[in-house]
Amino acid sequence: MRPDSTIARKIETVRGAKKNKTRLTVFVTVNSDGSDKRRAWLINKSKTPVAFRKAKINPDNWPIVYKSNKKAWMLSGIWYEFLGKLNEDMKAQGRHIALVTDNAPTHHPPEKPPIEYTGPKPSVLDHITLFYLPPNTTAWLQPLDAGIIRYLNAGYRRRYVTHIGHQQKFRLHHMRQP
């Protein structure tokens, strides 16, 4: 059973547990044949999570780019930072690419930032051409949603459930009988 479901009937109330509202945003970038995979970007609520501090983990040494904000959402500033770094990489490699993206509110082109955007001026994209998918078609037209992202979510949930199972097994094993 998944961690967000229960065997209680709808009219019954389940006491002692709340639904976990922990959120992460992960975004991945890959070319059409999968030969060029970029580092995934992970957005979390905490700038330095307790688990990182306890384990003395430096996210800069990870194979991902770690960012944080209050709601763990993709924001225009993070989007522009991502585009700037990708543009620099393409410039260094002497490549020009087409980047297909959805039309999320944070995915404004750098030359037209949203009115409420107050961050640094976005980079000029001279090695990236942005192509936006039409509204409400992401699930059908974006191959990452159907394959890679689905697999990533399934793997994350599997590891999460396994981790919770190990914790519960440990707790039950050490309980004393009355």
Q: Residue locations for each model-derived region?
A:
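RecA-like helicase/translocase P-loop NTPase motor core
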Residues: 1-178
